From Swiss-Prot:
It catalyses: 1D-myo-inositol 3-phosphate + UDP-N-acetyl-alpha-D-glucosamine = 1D-myo-inositol 2-acetamido-2-deoxy-alpha-D-glucopyranoside 3-phosphate + UDP + H(+). This is D-inositol 3-phosphate glycosyltransferase. Residues 1-21 are annotated as: Disordered. Its EC number is 2.4.1.250.
Length: 448
């Protein structure tokens, strides 16, 4: 079952809280306008957009501040009524990696402060920053505007550095220090899972009374099992995506980076050829996504890896999928693999399960919450390709087991929804506003 929206060690929801009228959402390094699976766009983009949409439906206006990366995008974009994206010019429009952005935080902060200064006093009731770069901006803005700061880390440097993939670079000390500062200054810290809450408290010395667990959700109307006969629907989905209609398909969906470990799945396919050549002959591995920081570039190193392992004919590479094609990919797959070295939650796992597709995931971080082991999928200890190959060889031929897991996958995913996430966030927002100062008396109250 999904965790409740609870503060660490406390029960909540027993009293009405003031509801903010307007929220300033900070997302320095990635925009909800960007396609997930490309560059630095991923689950955080989905989170920000889905939360903003539902906050607006609850009559809370949201203005999302992000760094401008294209001259073709206007300074302000209305994504929907009540949700605007403000593109702040801070440094060159292109060519900057996420690691280079700290040098542009001053320019970004200036743009945020100028935008607020053009409004009537007290325009924003609360700031919600996402990722440590945004937290640094939110820290200053909260002091200038006199409003509370709610922060969601999404990933934590100390956790990533403790679980580095081979060839991955450690997060720099400057990021660790920056995260420590934001943790100390934020009025509320939103963790995706109890595991992340524990990391904030144990690794960053966060005040437990300011740490709140609010799980992400999934769009249960968009990500659904195929209607009618599953085998026929799966074949149609594969035809739509140009995948083999016969045999087994195991899909990886996400940014192509060492942390996400798509190479583990390719190496597992090679190991399966040694373990069960007949089964391996029927397997197609799909890697869907683009390299971090480079948009839609082809993942050359994975193409070369597949060639060196002799599995080129078993691996298909797809660009990030949009619209109905992403649910179609999940439905086309027999299994979705999430072999990441760390995930604060793992929205891909939740989306796949909502489509009724079992997930094989590494037993790390938030994936332990996102996937219910032996019920909605299988959690694998470690990243040894031989172990992953053994897991695939057990699951793929066993149609009865996969059918049972498919039913459990949808049931498990139904415990999560974005409406539930926003209900929890509104409670956190209300607590933060109520604790911050007398201006909360001017706001509407809600029983979340």
């Amino acid at each position: 079952m999904a965790e409740q929206h609870t503060g660490v060690g406390r029960q909540r929801g027993a009293r009405p809280w003031p509801r903010p009228r307007r929220v300033a959402t900070l997302s320095v390094h990635t925009s909800p306008l960007h396609q997930p699976g490309t560059g630095d766009a991923g689950g955080m983009n989905v989170y920000i957009l889905e939360v903003a949409r539902r906050l607006a439906e609850a009559d809370v206006e949201v203005e999302i501040f992000t760094r401008a990366t294209s001259a073709d995008v206007p300074p302000v974009v209305e994504m929907m009524p009540g949700v605007h994206v403000r593109n702040i010019i801070s440094g060159p429009l292109g060519g900057l990696t996420k690691e280079e952005l700290p040098g542009q935080l001053c320019a970004f902060t200036a743009g945020v402060l100028r935008a607020e200064a053009s409004r009537a006093a007290g325009h924003y009731d609360l700031i919600h920053s996402h990722y440590w770069l945004s937290g640094q901006v939110g820290w200053l803005a909260k002091e200038r505007w006199g409003v509370p700061l709610v922060h969601t880390a999404h990933t934590l440097a100390k956790v990533k550095n403790a679980q580095l993939a081979a060839g991955d670079r450690p997060e720099p000390k400057a990021r660790v220090i920056g995260e420590e500062q934001v943790v100390a200054e934020a009025d509320r810290l939103v963790a995706n899972t109890k595991t992340e809450a524990g990391d904030l408290i144990d690794r960053y010395d966060a005040d437990p009374t300011r740490v709140e667990v609010v799980e992400p959700g999934v769009d249960l109307a968009r990500f659904t099992p195929a209607a009618g006969d599953r085998s026929r629907a799966q074949a149609l989905a594969r035809r739509r995506l140009g995948l083999p209609e016969r045999g087994y398909v195991v899909a990886f969906v996400g940014r192509v980076q060492p942390l996400k470990a798509p190479d583990v799945l390719i190496r597992a396919a090679a190991a399966l050829r040694q373990r069960d050549p007949a089964l391996a002959e029927e397997l197609t591995v799909v890697v869907c996504g683009g390299p971090s920081g480079s948009g839609l570039d082809r993942p050359t190193h994975l193409i070369e890896l597949a060639a060196s392992l002799g599995v080129t004919d078993s691996v298909r590479f797809l660009p990030p999928q949009t619209g109905d094609d992403l649910p179609a990919l999940y439905r086309a797959a027999d299994l979705v693999a999430v072999p990441s070295y760390n995930e604060s939650f793992g929205l891909v796992a939740l989306e796949a399960q909502a489509c009724g597709t079992p997930v094989v995931a590494a037993a790390v971080g938030g994936l332990v919450t996102a996937v219910r082991d032996q019920v909605s999928g299988v959690l694998v200890d470690g990243h040894d390709p031989a172990v992953w190959a053994r897991t695939l060889s057990r699951l793929l031929p066993d149609t009865g087991l996969r059918a049972t897991l498919a039913q459990g996958a949808r049931r498990h995913a139904c415990n999560f929804s974005w409406d539930r996430t926003v209900s929890g966030l509104l409670e956190v927002y209300g607590e933060a506003v109520a604790a911050y100062g007398p201006q909360s008396s001017e706001l509407a109250t809600c029983s979340c």
